[in-house]
């Protein structure tokens, strides 16, 4: 008996009946007549990985799923994902920016007198600790339990604790809630990049770079809201004593941004996203992988010739080969075991195999080490400078004439808006001959160069101009970095690998507020350190072994 799914977005709602969701079993198992089923060559010109990196069986099956996705093409389901997954990029930038925007406005949280000098960096430290734990926990869960759980729950954590933070009675509680909402934020990119990339045909993988458009938009939204709320509901600059009744802007700001995050959670939850077919493949559930491919095809209004028998045929051939080594036999067993294991069993058997597989071959190990190291270096460089950007804008230029609160947040908005076209340009550049590596290398070096140049500014307007240039190139850099990283890891370890890179980024990010506590921010030293780190990261990119342009990412 066959049932179909009309190509409408609301058919993805979890309230739809299971009967309407199911794809015909006959359609999945009995295809057009199958040619001789053989494991395809270890690598074609369009593949990024070969059998030295992962098992021949896994790569052959993954290639079949990629070809099926290419057959379906880019359609309604991918457009939907472009928006709801884009929320993850927005959130990843909104909340670190939110921390920097409220840093200088917490005068009244422990009474009417200003806080002790040097206390503000502890808030950034709390944020980075939360981001670190979130990156590790959510990314590992994405490769063991599944992408969908983390895809939804990260936003719930973030929104709830951000709203609660707006009612914080003291500075210590703000730090605690900042760490908790950052725990949710830490899982956005490792999970969302995986679920979006694995639903794309190879011809549209460049869209993963364009997703950084949402990252830039998140910064614009945060700065726009802060300009309207914090600048109008904060203690006047000329008052030496700040009372809570006069300083509610940062609270209104957190209520607003937390509420917005909960709305994005509702959008994801009410119109659900399918689990990634390649996650099912990595877990050995070939049937569910093929079923999900067919569901996506129906939403796009397309037909798909893929059947589960094509995947089973690869297993049969491998079992017939007597010269398989133990590691391949173990892999074949895991591929055929199905989804009868419970979540608890999956976690019990998780013995860091996912982490080991990120370094499975010499080439893959070199790639993993360099990518993780680059993320770590950038993790120190960016927050060292950007987390304290409002402070820099307020205190630099025109000798001893600080900017007003309104002008400080206006300038932050201008800087963030300049980054939006940079994100879009990044999506174009990665398809040119210089590819992902060339674009990433140049944007990193130019980011560092313009940070150096900003130290020559003598007025606040000149400093603002240099910061706009920095914002433009740094958004190009982040767009490519966030796309390149999931592309150069196979789907079976993609969440873990991106999580490792993000964790390294957060670990080094923890040192930025520590440095700020010890450094003199009235000098240009933090800027020089940050610029040098960006240039060093650009040099590392030259040695990346993989170039994903024009390749299928499995």
Curated annotation (Swiss-Prot):
Q: Which UniProt keywords apply?
A: Endoplasmic reticulum, Membrane, Phosphoprotein, Transmembrane, Transmembrane helix, Transport
A GO molecular function assigned to this protein is:
transmembrane transporter activity
Query: Can you tell me which family this protein belongs to?
Result: Belongs to the major facilitator superfamily.
Q: Which organism is it from?
A: Schizosaccharomyces pombe (strain 972 / ATCC 24843) (Fission yeast)
Q: What is the phylogenetic placement of the source species in the record?
A: Eukaryota, Fungi, Dikarya, Ascomycota, Taphrinomycotina
Indicate how the chain sits in the lipid bilayer. Multi-pass membrane protein
Its protein name is: Uncharacterized MFS-type transporter PB1E7.08c
Q: Identify residues that carry Phosphoserine.
A: 13, 334
Q: What is its main location?
A: endoplasmic reticulum
